[in-house]
Each structure stands twice: as structure tokens, then as C-alpha cells.
Amino acid sequence: MAKPNRVDAKKGRADRTAPAKVRIEGRPAQAGRELAPAGARISRRASDLLRAGHVWVYASEIESLVLAEEGDPPALLPVADSRGLLMGTALYSPASQIALRMVAREALSEAAWLELIEQRLRRAIERRVGLILSPLKGQSDSCRLCFSEADELPGIIADKYSDLVILQLLTKGVSSNSVRDVCVRVFRDLLKPAAILERPDPRIRELEGLDAPSTEPLWPADANNSKSATQFHLNGLTFHYDAGAGQKTGAFLDQHANYAAAEKWASQMAPGGRALDVCTYQGGFALHLARVSKSVTGIDASRASLEVAERNLTANREQSQLGTRVQVDWIEADAFEILRDWSSAGEVFDTIVLDPPAFAKSKRAVEGALRGYKELNLRALKMLRPGGLLITCSCSHHVGWTQLEDAVRSAAADAGRRVRLLARRGAAPDHPVVLNLPETEYLKCLVLEVD
């Protein structure tokens, strides 16, 4: 058995002689007792957060590590508090700031962890079937199947687009063939997809120190007989998905309930009006608004996204899901520049949707993000007719509800407009929020009437 390598996380050095004082599974601490075969001792602050239901431990909160000298660091680590009491088992990510992600409140072997993945993944999928796929059958055939920590599976994200399942394995602790095999088995058993593909998030995998996985399909194994593109449906509308392109894992499934809500609000407040969808991506809000508006304009900086939006428009016209009388235009432009020009030129709309990408991917970026949100909302407010509808979104976790509302309030003051809050909305229920883990809440959507 390899000798333990005791690492002082704060000093960044290895001490192979100092004993590791820790209690394993609640037994009294004894000098020289090792974390077997490896383990982490964390600060009191981190321990308190875990006891309150959080599941993350940052690298700066690890007081010491005991790791085997030989081989790669293990995927699973026992975690003890500062007194040496076992708190459970975590996935270990040595290259990440989030070094530990708790997966159980007891000691856990790798075999037991794989069994737990299967149980939790099955439960997550069954929950989506009950919440979305069964109630919306015939209208929506796509949703997020697994949402990482929100489903007690840190680093595992899976989306269903009609007959395709797209998997992301984003942490070192789950980026293994054994985990892939479990996921594929569950997807095939419960969903019977035409294909299962892994499409990583390069930015997150880089933070985790992970190489890009194979681009070959996970199932079927023969790439020549595997499909990578399909049509899927949300709220009775048709969209295209291509696994070889697109942001995130493809489309923004987290907005699908807000798409329907936007259509409903516009039908009540601005039927037959003129609508604008800013940062339209592939036309999600725009196509829903087209069912109740006389004309819709979608703006995006990505030509590739707008080409897909046009394909989506064509498909819905061909399938009679959209009338031929509604005018839909796509404009490739920077949102800030075109809104500034249009608001100065006196353009007027009945409905405006703002759905920009995340402006704040870290706390340091929040101040600049708030300036961006204020500017977009200011320009939109100047272009809305009295009684018009503004739907403004933020997908930045680091920007809270109060900060977003303050930005809109400040924009309204500068524009000389009075805004009435009609609804606060978040992500669809397939992207659940865990109250013990605030990081699972990121999408914020305000529905406003503008006087």
C-alpha cells in the first residue's frame, strides 16, 4: 500500500512524516491514523456550510489532504471537519477552485457511487417526465434531464432534444468511462433515444483540467449509423438542433416556459402588435411572439444563429404552426449599437424582449454587467409605446434579483417611464433551484408593463 502523502493545503507543501489526526466514520481521532486511502480535512466555515445543506468546498477551505503518493488523485475523497469527524464523501477536482463537491453524507466506495449515479439519474429523468414530457406531450418533446448539483449529480448535465440525448461530464470526478456507461444505460432504458452524444463545455473542462472527450457518439457505437441533428418541439413550435453547433448543449431549454409566458402576455397586452426580440439566438422568443403579433424582428450578433432561426421559421410556416401574414425579420447586429440607433431614430414597438448572454461570469464582473443591463433596458424603454410590454432577462447568477430590478428602475428613471412589475419568473422546472445551494438559481426574468 502506498504511503500517505499529507499535503498542507494552505502552505502548499507535502509533509510525509506528520501524522494525520482524523476520525474515520465517527471513531475517535488517533495520532497516526490515516485517511484511508485518501481524504480531506476542511475548515470550520466550510463544515458549517455543508451542514446547512451546501455541497461545495473551495480549495482555500481545505486545511489538509492525505493522498496516495502513486497514481492520479482519486475521484472520490472522504471529507472530515476540522475536528476530524467524517462528514461524507466528495468528488475531488484538484485543478478547480471548487475542489470538493459532496455527493454523500457517508463513506462511499466507487462501486456504491456508480450505483448512486444510476439511482439519482433515473429519479431525475422520471421527475422531468412527470413535470414536462407527459403533461406537454404533443407540444414539447425536449427538456433538461439532469441539472448537475440540483439533481445531486455534480458535473453531470443532460438534455433531451426529441430523439437525441446530449450529455456533458464537466468535473474530474464524473469524467470517466464508468460514469459514461451508467448514463448511457439509463438513457437507453428510460428514453429509447436514436443517439446519445457527449458535447462538452470547453471553458468548464479547461477549469477542471480536463481534456476534450472523444467526438464519437456514446451510442450507437457506429458513428456512420448515428444521427447528430434533429427537429424538436417546444410549446407546439418546431426547432432545429445540430450537435455539431450551438451554444451550451444546443438550445436554451431553460427559457421554454418563459417563451410560452411571453406569448401569453403579448396576446393580452399587445395583440397584433410590433415585437422585438433582442439577442434572439435561434428565434426562441421571436417565433412564439410571431403567433400573436403582426410583425417580429429578431436581433443577434451571430449570423450562424440567425441562419438557424430562419430555418426554424421556415419549418413552422411549412407545418402551419405560423401564419404567412406575420412578417418576421432577422438582423445581424450588435444589440447595444442598434438599440442606441433605433431609440435615437424614434422606433416604436409594442413588445420588446431582452435576453442577453451572461454579462457577469464572476463577482468581479457584476459592476460592468449592471451597466450593460441598464443600457439595454434604457434603450428598450425609450422605444416602447405607452402600455407596452417589456420582458427583460438575466442569466448571470452573480447578478441578483434586487440588482437587476435596480438596473431596470434606474433605466426607467432616465427614460422618464413608469414600469409596473407583472411577474418575476425563473428557469423552467427542468432546471430546479435548490434553496440550500443558491448557485443553482441563475435565470431571472421580469415581465413589465411600461407607461
Question: Where would I find each of the regions flagged by the language model?
Answer:
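Non-catalytic accessory regions of SAM-dependent methyltransferases
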Residues: 1-162
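Short, isolated positions in well-ordered beta-strands
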Residues: 87, 166, 238-239
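Cysteine-centered catalytic environments shared across enzyme families
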Residues: 112, 118-141, 166-216
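Non-catalytic substrate-recognition/targeting regions of SAM-dependent transferases
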Residues: 146-159, 179-252
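Short glycine-rich, basic-tinged beta-strand/loop micro-motifs
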Residues: 162-171, 388-395
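Mobile, glycine- and charge-enriched loop segments
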Residues: 58, 165, 270-274
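Rossmann-like S-adenosyl-L-methionine
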Residues: 220-451
